[in-house]
Amino acid sequence: MDTFSYRDAELFAEGVALSRIAERFGTPTYVYSRAHIEAQYRAYADALAGMPHLVCFAVKANSNLGVLNVLARLGAGFDIVSRGELERVLAAGGDPAKVVFSGVGKTRDDMRRALEVGVHCFNVESGEELERLQRVAAELGVKAPVSLRVNPDVDAQTHPYISTGLKENKFGIAIDEAEAVYARAAELDHLEVIGVDCHIGSQLTQLEPFLDALERLLGLVDRLAGKGIGIRHLDLGGGLGVRYRDEQPPLAGDYIRAIRERLHGRDLTLVFEPGRSIVANAGVLLTRVEYLKHTEHKDFAIVDAAMNDLIRPALYQAWMDVQAVRPRDAAPRRYDLVGPICETGDFLAKDRDLALAEGDLLAVRSAGAYGFVMSSNYNTRGRAAEVLVDGEQTHEVRRRETVQELYAGESLLPQ
């Protein structure tokens, strides 16, 4: 479903004109659709109906409290990688018993806080982490539920920066070492083994890597059962891709159906950690044209959003669709859309055919995931506002940063 559509030659988010949002909240502004978020979550939950499951939204994709609250109200779980993300989930009304704690660098404080609030499990990524968790749990006099993140050595066929399931990646425990680590976990009196986890990458557009990883994990589950180590849940992580341009990723329902067909009656709770597929196409970055600059070699549309607001094009060479909020009936020109940051790499899109004038509003599509969460204050620029649209209602779920807030935590040297 696409909740961003044109009505009377103007782009709307659900029932609200984007021009109205720009007038009220300014630009640049991230705009999210509640209806899209809910529909994408339900696509997972509905496909898993009739079997024990947990759909844990990957907070790293979009950690805004308003977005998290929408998902918490639906009964979602959450996949976190830091104490900060845990506190966000709690503040948004999330159930800690539905939280899985991933990440390669959990500190002792991270572990203590997660044990205090009672997370569902820790996705342990190394033998060293396992031993630390045992010590922290012993200090608190509790048992820590653990699932080992296993690296199945599967090529996710995605951008190398977001491929996480190969031997050379920093994530997880190599599958040929996993049985020994599980045996050690079973010996430790303050740990309880409950599952196996993997996450092979992000923005996957084919089922084959997922199914390859699944077969390897099921083989591991069977071998562990033969050694008396029971696995109760199978966490297949996230990674399902979305359409940015012309990709044709599988639908969540087709993906889950293929997984269920291969379980062959095993009594396992299925856990998924979707992020991008829930929120990417639920959001746009709304920006305004400041200048049109024409040179001998290039035409530039200089907009008020920049790489500090949306770094995906510069960092990943990601293609983002750009639409005029009010398209002009004029001959287009080919523009690079660039921001005010003092780097050549500050661009949102290149070689786009658009009919533009100074002051026009543009919507950078598919910006709901890894957009605001990766933003910065580079060039001492305040981060954008965030607005959540619900039907014909708009809610400012994060106000724009002021200049004074950018240095509020700093101080001068004493005289």
UniProtKB/Swiss-Prot annotation:
Catalytic activities: meso-2,6-diaminopimelate + H(+) = L-lysine + CO2
InterPro entries assigned to the protein according to its UniProt record, in alphabetical order: Ala_racemase/Decarboxylase_C, DAP_deCOOHase_LysA, De-COase2_C, De-COase2_N, De-COase2_pyr-phos_BS, Orn/DAP/Arg_de-COase, PLP-binding_barrel
Residues involved in substrate binding: R276, R312, Y316, E343, Y370
Cofactor(s) in the UniProt record: pyridoxal 5'-phosphate
SUPFAM superfamilies from the UniProt entry: Alanine racemase C-terminal domain-like, PLP-binding barrel
UniProt pathway: Amino-acid biosynthesis; L-lysine biosynthesis via DAP pathway; L-lysine from DL-2,6-diaminopimelate: step 1/1
Example of a GO MF term: diaminopimelate decarboxylase activity
Record keyword Ion transport present: no
UniProt keyword Transcription, yes or no: no
Active site: C342 (proton donor)
Disulfide cysteine pairs (residue numbers): none
Biological process according to GO: lysine biosynthetic process via diaminopimelate
Keywords: Amino-acid biosynthesis, Decarboxylase, Lyase, Lysine biosynthesis, Pyridoxal phosphate
Entry binding sites for pyridoxal 5'-phosphate: G239, E273, P274, G275, R276, Y370
EC number in record: 4.1.1.20
N6-(pyridoxal phosphate)lysine: modified positions: K60
Enzyme class: lyase
Its biological purpose: Specifically catalyzes the decarboxylation of meso-diaminopimelate (meso-DAP) to L-lysine.
Assigned protein family: Belongs to the Orn/Lys/Arg decarboxylase class-II family. LysA subfamily.
Assembly with partners or alone: Homodimer.
Protein's name according to its UniProt entry: Diaminopimelate decarboxylase
Organism: Pseudomonas aeruginosa (strain ATCC 15692 / DSM 22644 / CIP 104116 / JCM 14847 / LMG 12228 / 1C / PRS 101 / PAO1)
Primary gene name: lysA
